[in-house]
Design a protein with these regions (language model features):
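Alpha-helix capping/hinge segments and adjacent helical runs
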Residues: 192, 267, 384, 405-483, ...
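A glycine-rich, basic-preceded beta-loop-alpha segment at the flavin cofactor/substrate interface
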Residues: 242-259, 264, 271-312, 332-359, ...
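Amphipathic, small/basic residue-rich leader segments at the start of a protein or domain
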Residues: 1-119, 139, 143, 603-613
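A short core secondary-structure module
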Residues: 189-253
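C-terminal helix-coil-helix/basic helical segment that borders enzyme active sites and/or dimer interfaces
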Residues: 376-414, 527-541, 562-571
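Internal maturation/activation junctions in enzymes
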Residues: 61, 124-125, 136-189, 196, ...
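C-terminal amphipathic alpha-helical interaction region
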Residues: 475, 491-613
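Conserved phosphate/anionic-ligand binding catalytic regions in large, soluble enzymes, centered on
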Residues: 90-101, 117-120, 317-324, 420-439, ...
Length: 613
């Protein structure tokens, strides 16, 4: 119930999500319908996910040469998720959706991630289908996207290759027109693809009737050459099994072959694959090459894929958050029951006294408070960003523009900050368990292993940082950064006003508001200083410290808002106020060191000769 109470507070007391039913799209909804969705997901997560988190970690996917073998619990969890309707939760009624706000959908999915982050792959299927609903043709939407929303098909995103991980401009997969009639295929221009795709999550399995791959590839010109860089990349639908325009399987296997499984540190319940496209293992109509259908315009594939990637980045941030929360809950339970050591009194420790529980030690409280501040702060940010998606889709014109610009600058943060700091939280959860935490007798080591992926996939930490400092804060003369700064200044003013009206915690709110004001000023100065010379290589050399400081400032802003909404009586409100105070006292001061190297354009790292390592 601890997670549910936190989710309810953030949704209803802070974000006021129940007021969304004043908008036409959500007019049929109320807190009652939102709670029903949350109840269903909480129950399925408790019954079908949580009991099998260790099972999917120890019984990794296996390949028997023909198909992927998964434990039975994975199929059960998948089926329960499909039956819940969550794959199409935010979609229109007329295509089987519930028209739930994305904020509620994200909160509901948090229960699954907390119970077992790797047992389900719904995020990729939904992202795949959403991309097609935005960029696909009417028939592509009807046959592929709608069958993903109803759970009949699954979806993937195929970007990386063995030689090109994050460097998408170097993709070597090629797409050539499939016959003289390729342009007249009902599904869109038809091509044959040849190449390899690496690190493809849910790339092969038997959980669904079919798998729909969205694949990035380049189309050679008449001279056989491709356009250099990302401008020449196109996007294709490549089904594992071919489908008729009526949506039925034709009985033909497409030329997509599983080359092998990647055996990972964590996140082991999710199949991760190397796929070969067009190698000839499954020739189609007597010819090699995987059949694929162009999505959108040729050469515009990366722009289409970014729609899915941005959704995936918010999803990764929420997954990272829930792993942090899972570790927090586990270590909190352990600290409440494990006895160890004696308290320090005026005369030191008294060995005649019985040992006390871990939670009675100040340093254990420090580690628990850190986890609470990281996890609940990240969850608040994730749900806030989800609410911006709702603004983007249902707000008036001004609200939509503001939501778009805020999401531009916050998406790198909502992905990267939980990935880094909830990983630290998981490390602290192990520390609280002591030696037991380092064993497989307790779940915290698995949470850490699962968590370690999140700084890598869907855009590495460094790439997120360069995207933030190198692009997002500069767009349209820093429009998004300025808007975020205005939102923060509004919160600061409210907090200062709040501190004069409330009898409790007034001095803390005032101090926090002033500290946030200084942090915002420091971020602004660092942004300007980094680009003072106008040289990208110099400015971006310290992009990660910049992102760390930026993220800490954003989380401080979020915590200040949460604290102002937690001024009532009760342990939960006190806990949130204490977590806010911890963050401002122990975490926010760190930004000075990070920003010092940004402001001075420190070149220590960039200047280090290779031979000196």
């Amino acid at each position: 119930m601890a997670l549910r109470n936190t989710v309810d507070f953030l949704l209803y007391d802070w974000l006021k999500v129940d007021q969304l039913n004043q908008r036409v799209r959500f007019a049929d909804h109320s807190r009652e319908t939102f709670d029903a969705a949350l109840d269903t997901c909480e129950r399925i997560a408790r019954d079908k996910y949580a009991p099998f988190n260790r099972t999917v970690d120890t019984q990794e996917p296996a390949f028997d040469g023909e198909k992927v073998i998964l434990p039975a619990c994975t199929q059960d969890a998948h089926d329960a998720y499909v039956q819940s309707g969550m794959l199409s939760a935010a979609q229109d009624y007329d295509i089987g959706g519930m028209q739930l706000p994305y904020t509620v959908e994200a909160a509901a999915n948090a229960f699954f991630a907390c119970a077992s982050v790797s047992i389900g792959g719904g995020m990729l299927t939904v992202g795949n289908a959403n991309l097609l609903m935005k960029h696909g043709s009417a028939l592509q939407q009807e046959v592929f996207a709608l069958n993903e929303f109803n759970g009949r098909f699954a979806g993937t995103m195929c970007l990386s290759e063995p030689q090109a991980g994050s460097s998408l401009s170097d993709v070597a997969t090629r797409a050539t027109p499939d016959g003289d009639d390729h342009a007249s295929d009902p599904f869109g221009p038809r091509y044959r693809l040849k190449g390899n795709k690496m690190w493809i999550s849910t790339g092969d399995h038997e959980l669904t009737e079919n798998i729909i791959h969205l694949v990035l590839a380049k189309i050679p010109g008449a001279d056989g050459k491709t356009i250099a860089g990302t401008k020449g990349i196109s996007l294709f639908i490549v089904p594992k099994k071919l489908v008729s325009p009526q949506g039925q399987l034709t009985g033909e296997r497409n030329d997509v072959a599983l080359a092998g499984l990647n055996h990972k540190l964590g996140w082991r319940g999710t199949v991760n694959t190397l796929l070969n496209f067009g190698e000839g293992k499954y020739p189609v109509r007597g010819a090699t090459g995987a059949v694929g259908y162009l999505v959108g315009e040729a050469g515009k594939g990366l722009q289409c894929m970014f729609h899915m990637m941005n959704e995936a980045r918010i999803g990764v941030g929420l997954a990272a958050t829930m792993l942090g929360m899972a570790g927090y809950y586990a270590s909190l339970d352990y600290a409440k029951t494990r006895t160890q050591g004696r308290p320090v009194g005026p005369a030191g420790k008294d060995p005649s006294q019985p040992p006390v529980r871990l939670i009675e030690h100040a340093d254990i409280k420090r580690m628990l408070l850190a986890q609470k501040a990281y996890g609940e702060g990240a969850l608040a940010l994730g749900l806030y960003c989800a609410s911006l998606v709702d603004e983007l889709h249902t707000g008036d014109e001004a609200q939509q523009h503001q939501a778009q610009w805020l999401l531009e600058v916050l998406t790198p943060i909502v992905k990267s900050w939980p990935s880094e700091w909830c990983l630290e939280g998981n490390s602290l959860a192990i520390q609280i368990h002591g030696g037991y935490g380092y064993t497989r007798d307790f779940p915290v080591e698995q949470y850490w292993r699962d968590q370690r992926l999140n700084m890598i996939h869907e855009g590495t930490h460094g790439i997120q940082a360069m995207d933030l400092l190198g692009r997002k804060v500069l767009l349209e003369d820093g429009r998004g950064l300025k808007l975020l700064g205005e939102r923060m200044q509004t919160t600061i003013s409210l907090a200062l006003d709040h501190s004069h009206r409330e009898r409790s915690d007034a001095i803390h709110l005032q101090a926090h508001a002033l500290a946030l004001r200084q942090a915002v000023q420091n971020i602004t100065e660092a942004t300007q200083a980094a680009w003072a010379g106008g040289e990208p290589a110099v400015a971006l050399a310290n992009a990660v410290p910049y992102m760390q400081a930026f993220g800490h400032t954003v989380i401080a802003w979020v915590w200040l808002q949460v604290a102002m909404s937690s001024q009532g009586e009760g342990d939960a409100n006190l806990g949130r106020r204490q977590a806010c105070q911890f963050f401002f006292h122990y975490e926010l001061p760190k930004i000075s060191a990070w920003l010092n190297v940004v402001k001075s354009r420190d070149s220590t790292c960039a200047d280090m000769p290779e031979a000196a390592f």
